[in-house]
A protein has these predicted regions:
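Metzincin-family zinc-dependent endopeptidase catalytic domain
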Residues: 77, 131-234, 244-247
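Short hydrophobic beta-strand segments
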Residues: 69-82, 168-169
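Short amphipathic alpha-helices and their capping/turn segments at secondary-structure boundaries
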Residues: 54-72
Length: 291
């Protein structure tokens, strides 16, 4: 507990304006410091993983912290989304905005040629939705619900009555549908190491062969990124890039973060416990009342 410094005499009138300007500048710097990048994270088809190249990493400006979404909505139907700051209730995606921003960078033009006109980066995108079987879809929903069963969050494929601050998971299609040319990408999510309000995440089920377990675990990873979880360097954890690992879950163990090599986690922490981190963010699932 620190002592309060002694009160100083009021500054002269001319100094008040200087001090006020200084306070405003400091406040703006504090706000700027609170703004962090959202790193798009990718998962590769049929369980194959790779570390994103520096050129594949996009950073999107967003202010945190936010309250965690209590509903994970798995959307199997065709879906239209627009680029912008994440707002799942309105179908607005920061990931799409980042992809569009990258595509809008002018390409080098050879002498004597005319540059191609750029498409409107604000245009919406239409995703095809789930093209697997109904049985496979029901298995995906059950699998995702089991992954998040320990936590106080609802997993559903029925449109929620209240769309405010849900995790919208667009399931289906391929990365090219979003404008991503790398066919190895299986999922995309916004990430900055903290909770993202009303996020939209993507799981390219067709690129993953509509394989139930792979789609399920990809959903788990991408949703967990929106709750602030980093990649974990543990083969049995949902957050891993490692393979082959068999069936994965959120593991109650302190592990190093990393993709193909161990590293510190986002924010500088040496380890991450994916199970306890989700418990911290969402809380435990309430016990069912006794009959």
């Amino acid at each position: 507990m620190s002592r309060k410094p002694p009160l100083s005499a009021p500054p002269p009138r001319g100094r008040k304006r200087t001090l006020l300007i200084g306070v405003v500048v400091v406040a703006l710097l504090a706000i700027a410091g609170a703004i962090s990048g959202l790193v798009i994270v990718t998962r590769l088809e049929t369980g194959e993983w790779k570390v994103p190249d520096p050129g594949e990493i996009e950073r999107i400006v967003k202010i945190a912290p936010r309250q965690p979404a209590r509903t994970i909505f798995l959307e199997r139907r065709p879906l239209e989304l627009r680029p912008g700051t994440d707002d799942s209730s309105k179908g607005v995606s920061s990931v799409l905005a980042s992809v569009r921003a990258k595509a809008a960078k002018p390409a080098p033009v050879k002498a004597g040629t005319v540059a191609k006109p750029q498409a409107d980066p604000r245009r919406p995108v239409k995703l095809p939705g789930w093209k697997g079987t109904d049985k496979g879809w029901n298995q995906v929903v059950s699998c995702v619900a089991k992954l998040f069963a320990p936590f106080d969050v609802t997993v559903t494929d029925k449109p929620p009555a209240d769309l405010d601050n849900i995790v919208l998971v667009a399931v289906g299609g391929r990365p090219v549908d979003l404008g991503v040319s790398d066919r190895r990408v299986g999922g995309l999510a916004p990430f900055h190491g903290g909770v993202i309000a009303s996020p939209v995440v993507f799981v390219f089920a067709a690129q993953l062969g509509n394989d139930v377990r792979t789609v399920c675990e990809t959903v788990g990873m991408e949703v967990a990124h929106a709750y602030g979880l980093d990649h974990g360097f543990l083969c049995s954890d949902v957050m891993t890039y490692l393979k082959p690992c068999g069936t994965k879950k959120f593991v109650d163990k302190d592990v190093r973060c990393g993709e193909l090599a161990a590293r510190n986690c986002e924010g500088g922490e040496p380890t991450q416990n994916s199970y306890k981190r989700l418990l911290q963010v969402l809380g435990p699932r309430p016990a069912k009342p006794a009959r």
